[in-house]
Amino acid sequence: MAFAPPLPIRRRKVLIPRPRSRFLLVTCPKCGNRQVVFSHSTFRARCLNCGEVLVEPTGGKARILGKIERIYG
């Protein structure tokens, strides 16, 4: 009974992990001010002009309450 020789082990390319978080340009629904916020924010981000809450933390990704204009990164 002959066994086949073991196949050579192929190494996979090491993938560089990339962050899933992004910076977002968000427009305030109340006054229209545009502001950059973090997508995984751990605190409430308020509009610098009117004080309206733009981002609420949820324990992971933050809930974005304004309109997302652009995604950076």
UniProtKB/Swiss-Prot annotation:
Cofactor list: Zn(2+)
SUPFAM superfamilies hit by this protein: Zn-binding ribosomal proteins (SSF57829)
Zinc fingers (C4-type) by residue: 28-50
Gene3D superfamilies: Zn-binding ribosomal proteins
GO cellular component, as recorded: ribonucleoprotein complex; ribosome
Subunit comment: Part of the 30S ribosomal subunit.
Name of this protein: Small ribosomal subunit protein eS27
Gene source species: Aeropyrum pernix (strain ATCC 700893 / DSM 11879 / JCM 9820 / NBRC 100138 / K1)
